[in-house]
Design a protein with these regions (language model features):
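Phosphate-binding and adjacent anionic-ligand microenvironments
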Residues: 1-154, 159-163, 170-176, 182-190
């Protein structure tokens, strides 16, 4: 699959619009803020343009309305267009798993889980070891033939959050990979 036919640079950041805003600031320092096209995160937050540095639901709604109008003139529904994109680029699905560990014992359990996950041979990247702006208590697992899982403790709640991503040649394939991925990672939590 050709995942980047228009040669757009994709910059990965940690979850949160603070980090997307940081990327815009870096572009500004280079005099290239106009090259920022679109930012998004897993929780359905979107940002187009550089004038707002946070989730912009109003702008996202206008973009969707414009897109619906554009495709309506071509007699194509947004769902039909989405299906075309899936067929061209692959079916990517995501899931956010929240694993709660209440109380003082829960906090200790969360620390233990993160320590054990850091020892896993499946670990791809430990952002706690990063020296750049991506330094955080976040772990990334890229697991061949399954997908990607990004693990972090919540900063505000007694839970571990896991962002799961699986890609398949069709929706059934993607869902099967997602199921295998979540089972594998959940076993690692015990």
């Amino acid at each position: 699959m050709n995942l980047n036919p228009v040669r757009v640079t994709v910059i990965d950041t940690l979850t949160g619009f603070k980090f997307i805003g940081d990327q815009i600031a870096i572009l500004e320092e280079k005099g290239r803020e106009d090259s920022f096209i679109f930012g998004f995160e897993e929780s359905c937050g979107y940002l187009s343009g550089t004038y707002v540095r946070d989730k912009d639901a109003v702008n996202a709604a206008v973009l969707i309305a414009d897109m619906a109008d554009y495709y309506k003139d071509k007699d194509i529904s947004l769902l039909d267009r989405l299906e075309e994109l899936y067929k061209k680029f692959g079916y990517l699905i995501s899931y956010l798993g929240n694993y709660e560990y209440p109380g003082t014992a829960g906090l200790s359990k969360m620390r233990s889980i993160m320590e054990n996950l850091r020892k896993s041979t499946l670990l791809t990247k430990d952002y706690l070891n990063e020296t750049d702006m991506l330094h955080a208590d976040v772990l990334k697992f890229d697991i061949k033939d399954f997908g990607t899982a990004i693990v972090r403790p919540s900063g505000t709640e007694p839970k571990i959050k896991i962002y799961y991503f699986a890609e398949g040649c069709d929706m059934i394939d993607a869902k099967e990979k997602m199921k295998k991925l979540t089972v594998l990672i959940e076993r690692m939590l015990n």
